[in-house]
Regions:
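PLP-dependent enzyme catalytic core of the Aspartate aminotransferase-like
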Residues: 41, 106, 122-185
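Active-site C-terminal subdomain of aminotransferase-like
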Residues: 1-89, 93-123
Length: 185
C-alpha cells in the first residue's frame, strides 16, 4: 500500500488488516487482465439472457418472467434510460409449485444450482429453499418470493446450449402438468 502521508498509510493499513480487503499482487494482475475482456463478456451475457427470455416469455410452464429488458417490466423505461444493457440476471416463476421447480431443476444440465451469482458460468438459485429459507412462508410471500421463483445468472456458454437446456427443463414441467409440449422458437 502506498500513501503520501505516513498517518494516512497507517490508518489505511489498519483498516485493510482489520477487514481483509487487500488483494495479493496476483489478484491485482488477474483483475487487470480480466478487465480487458469485460465488455465482450458482458455483451455475451446479455445476448444469452435475451435469447432465454425469448424462449421463456409466454411459455406454458412459466407463470411470470422478470427481466428489465422486457417492455412489460415495471422498471423497463428507467433501465433503458440509465443503462447500456439489461444485464444477465432474470427471475422466473415456474408453474406447479415445488414439484414444478424440482422437475425444472432436475432437467437442467448447463445451469448449476448455486447461491453465488454473476460469474461466467450459468447459475440458478431457488430462493425459497436457499437464500431466503430462514424466512417464514408468509414473509417470503410478502416479499414476492414464492415457492416457484427461480433466479438465474446467465453465463457466456453457447446460447444454443443454454436454450436447449432451458427448453428441456420446461418440457419436464409441462409433462408434469399433463399438457402438450410447446415447440421451441
Amino acid at each position: 500500500m502506498i500513501a503520501k502521508e505516513a498517518a494516512l498509510h497507517e490508518q489505511l493499513a489498519w483498516w485493510a488488516n482489520a477487514l481483509g480487503i487487500t488483494g495479493s499482487p496476483f489478484d491485482s494482475f488477474l483483475t487487470l487482465r480480466g478487465l480487458r475482456t469485460l465488455d465482450a463478456r458482458l455483451r455475451v451475457h446479455q445476448e444469452n439472457t435475451a435469447a432465454l427470455v425469448e424462449l421463456l416469455d409466454g411459455h406454458a410452464a412459466v407463470r411470470a418472467l422478470h427481466w428489465p429488458g422486457r417492455a412489460a417490466h415495471p422498471g423497463h423505461l428507467i433501465a433503458a434510460r440509465q443503462q447500456s444493457g439489461f444485464g444477465a440476471m432474470l427471475s422466473v416463476e415456474i408453474e406447479g409449485g415445488e414439484a414444478g421447480v424440482r422437475a425444472f431443476l432436475d432437467g437442467l444440465r448447463c445451469f448449476t444450482l448455486a447461491e453465488s451469482l454473476g460469474g461466467v458460468e450459468s447459475l440458478v438459485a431457488h430462493p425459497a429453499t436457499m437464500t431466503h429459507a430462514a424466512m417464514s412462508p408468509e414473509a417470503r410471500a410478502a416479499a414476492g418470493i414464492g415457492d416457484g421463483l427461480l433466479r438465474f445468472s446467465v453465463g457466456i456458454e453457447h446460447a444454443d446450449d443454454l436454450r436447449a437446456d432451458i427448453a428441456a427443463a420446461l418440457d419436464r414441467v409441462v409433462a408434469l402438468q399433463g399438457q402438450p409440449k410447446r415447440s421451441s422458437r
